[in-house]
Swiss-Prot record:
It comes from the Viruses. Belongs to the orthopoxvirus OPG086 family. This is Entry-fusion complex protein OPG086. The gene is OPG086. Induction: Expressed in the late phase of the viral replicative cycle. Interacts with OPG099/L5. Component of the entry fusion complex (EFC) composed of OPG053/F9, OPG076/O3, OPG086/G3, OPG094/G9, OPG095/L1, OPG099/L5, OPG107/H2, OPG143/A16, OPG104/J5, OPG147/A21 and OPG155/A28. Except for OPG095/L1 and OPG053/F9, each of the EFC proteins is required for assembly or stability of the complex. Residues 22-111 are virion surface. One of its GO terms (biological process) is symbiont entry into host cell. Unglycosylated because produced in viral factories instead of the classic ER -Golgi route. Keywords: Fusion of virus membrane with host cell membrane, Fusion of virus membrane with host membrane, Late protein, Membrane, Signal-anchor, Transmembrane, Transmembrane helix, Viral envelope protein, Viral penetration into host cytoplasm, Virion, Virus entry into host cell. The chain crosses the membrane at residues 1-21. It comes from Vaccinia virus (strain Western Reserve) (VACV). GO terms for cellular component: membrane; viral envelope; virion membrane.
Length: 111
């Protein structure tokens, strides 16, 4: 009978140890785990949108149109699109209206 009690207490100890090892036991751990989960989702979204190479038309002047090949990268964490054109890097902020007005014709005229 005593050995059965020891076995039950040992299994209870193993279950409690497992709980404290693998589950958050305070608010800080719970917050960190939640933040890590959100960051993993954002990282996965960014990986799903690959760096793209687009053939597009660039308006160098009001009357001049040049065909160019651009490389685009979208980062949803900071809300920016990074465009590489002829070795120059241009960054567009998606929360700025002027940047959106500049970027929209480039994306609409690309294939």
């Amino acid at each position: 009978m005593a050995s059965l009690l020891y076995l039950i207490l040992f299994l209870l100890f193993v279950c409690i140890s497992y709980y404290f090892t693998y589950y958050p036991t305070n608010k800080l751990q719970a917050a960190v785990m939640e933040t890590d989960r959100e960051n993993a989702i954002i990282r996965q979204r960014n990986d799903e949108i690959p760096t793209r190479t687009l053939d597009t038309a660039i308006f160098t002047d009001a009357s001049t149109v040049a065909s160019a090949q651009i490389h685009l990268y979208y980062n949803s964490n900071i809300g920016k699109i990074i465009m590489s054109l002829n070795g120059k890097k241009h960054t567009f902020n998606l929360y700025d209206d002027n940047d959106i007005r500049t970027l929209l014709p480039i994306l609409l005229l690309s294939k």
